[in-house]
């Protein structure tokens, strides 16, 4: 007698709607990744403890002392947290609502309809509708489906893979991406001023208007029968320069801040902004790319819309800007292209002695090889790894690494968080 083979649905949505009471073992995360996970709705209500800062961008374009005050507030949040809620950001509630309705309408369609837009991860094509494959360091899956595509500049987009239904998806998403691009310029200006640089310096360093890519990723997190055992998105930092995130007011974003997981509140009419690895590198670690993850719940479906602002993969060498380096603060990061930085994160999963993410260094540990490696002056010419990486796709997802928390707060081991064969490309992830 041949035993029947039980197959797990390829989409998390189908699995969630199948009526299961326990999640399949491939979705159960290792215990060390589950520290700090409780009832997300109760966590979100807590007022005690650290809170993600809220930055008011009203009159950020002002020429007077107000912009200097805004600069100080945003700079402080970027240095201390690397993430913030942006309010009075200049993007209308009407447009944001259109973007949300379009994304939710697409995911409300039957899975069979969405499969018409399925990506081909096995062949490196990550644009379109998909789910994470079991390619993280621990071999486990994430409780998430997604839709991913390049959103800006217009000449880099492939509209053929954008959803045709609803009809407002393309116009709403296109206009939103255009306005996020303008907002990114304003933020990069403030961050440049905060480092004592010329206003346009950081924008130039990440590719300028011509080459900075905006990648859209809609994350769909179905209800989960055992949310205490699963993760929607594994712990990671974004490789982007900046990441801008909308959500449907269902909590789920957690930040690893000062040795503990902090749940972000749902702030009405706000956009969450992350500082990514790219800006952290250029600022020599003055601005932080914070470790974060997405948790799930059994009561409500959660959506997030992430736009990752990424530099070109090969044109620019990412390294600390000369103005951020002193004898007391030598370069903390070796020079790499963006593609090499992504590959470094993707392929460090087996190098457990060296791959340590966001490690707190003592003075006598400055030579320790880690993800955020502190280089001595005589090592500044060290060659970045994985030099021969080629770009197979113009666009690739922007979330690229997993960090497994070791329970001690400071040292987190690098894991691979990739969309599968991502052209050593990336958002992910809120």
UniProtKB/Swiss-Prot annotation:
Residues 376-430 are annotated as: Disordered. It catalyses: a (2R,3S,4S)-leucoanthocyanidin + 2-oxoglutarate + O2 = a 4-H-anthocyanidin with a 3-hydroxy group + succinate + CO2 + 2 H2O. It is an enzyme of class 1 (oxidoreductase). Residues 376-407, 415-430 have a biased composition (Basic and acidic residues). One of its GO terms (biological process) is anthocyanin-containing compound biosynthetic process. Predominantly expressed in corollas and at lower levels in anthers. Fe cation binds at residues 236, 238, 292. Pathway: Pigment biosynthesis; anthocyanin biosynthesis. The keyword Metal-binding applies. Keywords: Dioxygenase, Flavonoid biosynthesis, Iron, Metal-binding, Oxidoreductase, Vitamin C. Residues 212-311 form the Fe2OG dioxygenase domain. GO terms for molecular function: L-ascorbic acid binding; leucocyanidin oxygenase activity; metal ion binding. Its EC number is 1.14.20.4. Induction: By gibberellic acid (GA). It comes from the Eukaryota. Binds 1 Fe cation per subunit. Binds 1 ascorbate molecule per subunit. Its cofactor is Fe cation; L-ascorbate. The keyword NAD does not apply. It holds the Pfam family 2OG-FeII_Oxy. Oxidation of leucoanthocyanidins into anthocyanidins. Belongs to the iron/ascorbate-dependent oxidoreductase family. This is Leucoanthocyanidin dioxygenase. It comes from Petunia hybrida. The gene is ANT17.
């Amino acid at each position: 007698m041949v035993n029947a083979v039980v197959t797990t649905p390829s989409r998390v949505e189908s699995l969630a709607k199948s009526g299961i009471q326990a999640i399949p073992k491939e979705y159960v995360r290792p215990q060390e990744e589950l520290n700090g996970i409780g009832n997300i709705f109760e966590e979100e209500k807590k007022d005690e403890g650290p809170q993600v800062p809220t930055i008011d961008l009203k009159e950020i374009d002002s020429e007077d002392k107000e912009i200097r005050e805004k600069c100080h507030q945003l700079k402080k949040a970027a240095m201390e947290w690397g993430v913030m809620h942006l309010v009075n950001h200049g993007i209308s509630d009407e447009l944001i609502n259109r973007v949300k309705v379009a994304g939710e309408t697409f995911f409300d369609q039957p899975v069979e309809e969405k499969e018409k837009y399925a990506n081909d991860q096995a062949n490196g094509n990550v644009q379109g509708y998909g789910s994470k494959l079991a390619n993280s360091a621990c071999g486990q899956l994430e409780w998430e489906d997604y839709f991913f595509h390049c959103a800006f500049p217009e000449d880099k987009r492939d509209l053929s893979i954008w959803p045709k239904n609803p009809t407002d998806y393309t116009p709403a998403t296109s206009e939103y991406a255009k306005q996020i691009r303008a907002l990114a310029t304003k933020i990069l200006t403030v961050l440049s001023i905060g480092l004592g640089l010329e206003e346009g310096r950081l924008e130039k360093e990440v590719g300028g208007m011509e080459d900075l890519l905006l990648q859209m990723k809609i994350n769909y997190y179905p209800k989960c029968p055992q949310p205490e055992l699963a993760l929607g998105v594994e712990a990671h930092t974004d490789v982007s320069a900046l990441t801008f995130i909308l959500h449907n007011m269902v909590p789920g974003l957690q930040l690893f801040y000062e040795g503990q997981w902090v749940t972000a509140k749902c702030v009405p009419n706000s956009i969450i902004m992350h500082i990514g690895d790219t800006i952290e590198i250029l600022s020599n670690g003055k601005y932080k790319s914070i470790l974060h993850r997405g948790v799930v719940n059994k009561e409500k479906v959660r959506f997030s819309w992430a736009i990752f602002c990424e530099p070109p993969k090969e044109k620019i060498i990412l390294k600390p800007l000369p103005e951020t380096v002193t004898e007391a603060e030598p370069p903390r990061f070796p020079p790499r292209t963006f593609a090499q930085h992504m590959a470094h994160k993707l392929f460090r999963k087996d190098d457990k002695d060296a791959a340590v993410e966001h490690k707190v260094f003592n003075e006598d540990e400055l030579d320790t090889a880690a993800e955020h490696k502190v280089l001595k002056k005589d090592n500044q010419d060290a060659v970045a790894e994985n030099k021969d990486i080629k770009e197979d796709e113009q666009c690739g997802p922007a979330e690229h690494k997993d960090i497994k928390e070791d329970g001690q707060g400071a040292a987190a081991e690098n894991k691979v968080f990739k969309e599968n064969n991502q052209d050593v490309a990336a958002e992910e992830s809120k």
